[in-house]
């Protein structure tokens, strides 16, 4: 349903944000 779609989108956003944060940290080291 709609709720599971929202949860999936949230998970994807968290993953993308985590990857971006890791990339920024790696770049700054």
Swiss-Prot record:
List of residues that carry Valine amide: 29
Pfam assignment, any one: DD_K
Keywords from the named record: Amidation, Amphibian defense peptide, Antibiotic, Antimicrobial, Secreted
Cellular component terms per the entry's GO annotation: extracellular region
Subcellular location: Secreted
GO biological process: defense response to bacterium
Predominant localisation class: secreted
Stored InterPro entries: Dermaseptin_dom (IPR022731)
Tissue expression per record: Expressed by the skin glands.
Summary of the function given for this chain in its UniProt record: Has antimicrobial activity.
Protein family: Belongs to the frog skin active peptide (FSAP) family. Dermaseptin subfamily.
Protein name: Dermaseptin-J6
Organism: Phasmahyla jandaia
Species lineage: Eukaryota, Metazoa, Chordata, Craniata, Vertebrata
């Amino acid at each position: 349903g709609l709720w599971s779609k929202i949860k999936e989108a949230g998970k994807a956003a968290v993953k993308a944000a985590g990857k971006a944060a890791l990339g920024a940290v790696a770049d700054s080291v």
